[in-house]
Amino acid sequence: MIGHLRGIIVEKQPPYLLLEVAGVGYEITAPLSTFYHLPEPQEEILLYTHLIVREDAHTLYGFHNDHERRLFRALIKVNGVGPKLALAILSGIGPDEFVHCVLNQNIDQLVRIPGVGRKTAERLVIETKDGLSRWHTNDTPSPEGLRSSNTQPTQDAISALMALGYKPQEAKRAIDAIQKPDLSAETLIRLALKQMVLGT
């Protein structure tokens, strides 16, 4: 098992990034909560990782801290929740907000995440509440000021939302509603998700 990787970011486009470690490029899938903390390409970063091995693929998932990784591991143990949905949850409302929803049994907010129906939301609360009640974190994502090296942040943001399960029209409408110029892709994604999932 690969516990963590320290290397140089070669490129990043949510939800994927390429990390070079000792001359080897690792393709890593990460939630948007992790992307909010990533530095610019060519800078060094430490990512906590989780490797999932299947017959047709070896997929490496990366996280900003161990709290995110532990939450991811707890999510994929829930019946009906796979890695893709776990990433959508972490990307949609973030680790701290998810813990808050579970501890307060806020089913209505959980079902606003693409792929999470009422039954799944109820299972998430039932199966993770005891474990999450012992978790605490003050590590809140703060994407403001982060810049994307991509020259098409709007298109990148729309693509990332589609990768999370939103329809193209929904993704475009959410991004278009953010009438603020010169924002990075990461900031556009965060603001769009805040509007769609949290309703603010």
Curated annotation (Swiss-Prot):
Record keywords: Cytoplasm, DNA damage, DNA recombination, DNA repair, DNA-binding
Main localisation: cytoplasm
UniProt region (Disordered), positions on chain: 133-152
Entry keyword DNA damage: yes
GO cellular component: cytoplasm; Holliday junction helicase complex; Holliday junction resolvase complex
Any one biological process term the GO annotation gives: DNA repair
Location of this chain's protein in the cell: Cytoplasm
Segments for region (Domain I): 1-64
Keyword Oxidoreductase belongs to the record: no
Region described as Domain III: 149-200
Signal peptide stretch: none
Annotated region (Flexible linker), positions in chain: 144-148
Matches recorded under CDD domains: UBA_RuvA_C
Family: Belongs to the RuvA family.
Subunit structure: Homotetramer. Forms an RuvA(8)-RuvB(12)-Holliday junction (HJ) complex. HJ DNA is sandwiched between 2 RuvA tetramers; dsDNA enters through RuvA and exits via RuvB. An RuvB hexamer assembles on each DNA strand where it exits the tetramer. Each RuvB hexamer is contacted by two RuvA subunits (via domain III) on 2 adjacent RuvB subunits; this complex drives branch migration. In the full resolvosome a probable DNA-RuvA(4)-RuvB(12)-RuvC(2) complex forms which resolves the HJ.
Domain remark from Swiss-Prot or TrEMBL: Has three domains with a flexible linker between the domains II and III and assumes an 'L' shape. Domain III is highly mobile and contacts RuvB.
Function comment: The RuvA-RuvB-RuvC complex processes Holliday junction (HJ) DNA during genetic recombination and DNA repair, while the RuvA-RuvB complex plays an important role in the rescue of blocked DNA replication forks via replication fork reversal (RFR). RuvA specifically binds to HJ cruciform DNA, conferring on it an open structure. The RuvB hexamer acts as an ATP-dependent pump, pulling dsDNA into and through the RuvAB complex. HJ branch migration allows RuvC to scan DNA until it finds its consensus sequence, where it cleaves and resolves the cruciform DNA.
Protein name: Holliday junction branch migration complex subunit RuvA
UniProt organism field: Coxiella burnetii (strain RSA 493 / Nine Mile phase I)
Taxonomic classification: Bacteria, Pseudomonadati, Pseudomonadota, Gammaproteobacteria, Legionellales
Recorded name of the encoding gene: ruvA
